[in-house]
């Protein structure tokens, strides 16, 4: 991973126009007539149309391509609870990624509120502005209540990306990794180390794809989450095991086919990796330091399939290959939600793309001559421009088929062609 100095990072954000995003007009504005259309008196006409038919906001405003990136700064990357304002650079960065990868406009909104109920009310009050809401960096367990309530009480897509983005990308990677090693998800034994928002969402999604609950062991900072424990919340209790033979990570890893780490760095050692089943799969997703490094895992078990959150090793789990395209597809059909069928469609589309021949420009971006589906490539790269077409169209189709779309797509070939050019605009 390229080393970045503190001063380089500060200069990047400060020099020129401070920050990373700006508002750009989309209509002519050079003449007095243009301005009279953009504002008074011409602006009254779309206002009156929207008053009569609220859905016309999608016709006359940018609502249909606008997402709010909303955070209270209570769980910012590896920084923890740094507060709403200090989290603003991260939210601006998320907005930048929405635009460059998905062509989605977004406003970053930092809400200085820790109380879940008051936070929910703030988001509901500003929701009419947006076509979708991306919740970001909100600590568990409050994030579960906040997302659940907002999904139920708003008629636009709401997604907490820290939960579902990680789950979707890792699930796509898991399905492909299992194919490479010749195992079925229904048969594997899995260890999930971590029980926060991302870990809970990952486990739920894996189960929906066939993982058996009895084959899953989840751990938090106090050890295995078991039915015998009385110190666990309702989200953790959902994954409590009744096994009495495992109490520690070392015991849980013995004979496991899959390890998914969403915890802290350097918690897995070589002996644990050696104790795993034949051709084990390790997703060490703690950032910036994974639970075990790629080199250490490979040294312990040359047959391991490995994924991390880092760019300098194969098979990076990176949410940017998910959220811009999930929201793109949801916005394009004016969806009222991002539901399970849409998330599952994203998983399948991402997994399928990795199995297709890879364009030369993708391999060259990583200094490689070629990329071929297998142990060192089972997750698409973020620079792959096919993602916007495949994932967005899959999500849009799932929204229509599951009944949450308010705007149909009549010509799928034309839609896919438009997606292919969108990020070039």
Language-model segments: residues:
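Rossmann-like adenosine-cofactor binding region
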Residues: 237-305, 310-312
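General beta-strand structural signal in soluble alpha/beta enzymes
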Residues: 108, 134-137, 158-161, 192, ...
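N-terminal ligand-binding/catalytic initiation module
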Residues: 1-158, 392, 397-408, 422-425
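Solvent-exposed alpha-helices and their adjacent loops that cap or buttress functional pockets
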Residues: 58-63, 99-100, 125-127, 151-152, ...
């Amino acid at each position: 991973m390229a080393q970045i100095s503190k001063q380089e990072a500060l200069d990047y954000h400060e020099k020129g126009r401070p920050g990373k995003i700006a508002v750009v007009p989309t209509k002519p504005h050079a003449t007095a007539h243009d301005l009279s259309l953009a504002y008074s008196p011409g602006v009254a006409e779309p206002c009156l149309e929207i008053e009569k038919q609220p859905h016309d906001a999608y016709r006359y405003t940018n609502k249909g391509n606008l997402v709010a990136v909303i955070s209270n700064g209570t769980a910012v990357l590896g920084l923890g609870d740094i507060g709403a304002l200090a989290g603003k650079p991260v939210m601006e960065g998320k907005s930048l990624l929405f635009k460059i990868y998905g062509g989605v406009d977004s406003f970053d909104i930092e809400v200085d509120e820790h109380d879940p109920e008051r936070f929910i009310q703030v988001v509901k009050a500003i929701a009419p502005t947006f076509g979708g809401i991306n919740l970001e960096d909100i600590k568990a367990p409050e994030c579960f209540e906040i997302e659940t309530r907002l999904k139920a009480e708003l008629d636009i897509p709401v997604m907490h990306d820290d939960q579902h983005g990680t789950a979707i990308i890792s699930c796509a990677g898991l399905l492909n990794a299992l194919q490479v090693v010749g195992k079925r998800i229904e048969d594997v034994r899995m260890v999930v180390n971590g029980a926060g928002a991302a870990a809970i969402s990952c486990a739920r999604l894996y189960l929906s794809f066939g993982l058996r609950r009895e084959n899953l062991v989840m751990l938090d900072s106090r050890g295995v989450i078991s039915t015998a424990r009385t110190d666990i919340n309702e989200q953790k209790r959902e994954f409590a095991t009744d096994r009495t033979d495992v109490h520690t990570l070392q015991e849980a890893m013995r004979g496991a086919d899959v390890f998914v780490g969403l915890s802290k760095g350097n918690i897995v050692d070589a002996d644990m990796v050696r104790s795993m089943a034949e051709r084990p799969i390790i997703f060490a997703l703690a950032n910036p330091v994974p639970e075990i490094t790629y080199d250490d895992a490979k040294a312990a078990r040359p047959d391991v399939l490995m994924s991390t959150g880092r760019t300098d090793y194969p098979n990076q789990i990176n949410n940017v290959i998910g959220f811009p395209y999930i929201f793109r597809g949801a916005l394009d059909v004016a969806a009222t939600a991002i539901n399970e069928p849409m998330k599952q469609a994203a998983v399948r589309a991402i997994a399928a793309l990795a199995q297709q021949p890879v364009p030369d420009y993708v391999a060259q971006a990583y200094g490689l001559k070629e990329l071929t589906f297998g142990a060192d490539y089972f997750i698409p790269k973020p620079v792959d421009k096919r993602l916007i077409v495949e994932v967005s169209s899959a999500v849009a189709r799932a929204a229509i088929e599951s009944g949450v779309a308010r705007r149909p797509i009549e010509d799928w070939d034309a839609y896919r062609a438009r997606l292919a050019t969108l990020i070039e605009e």
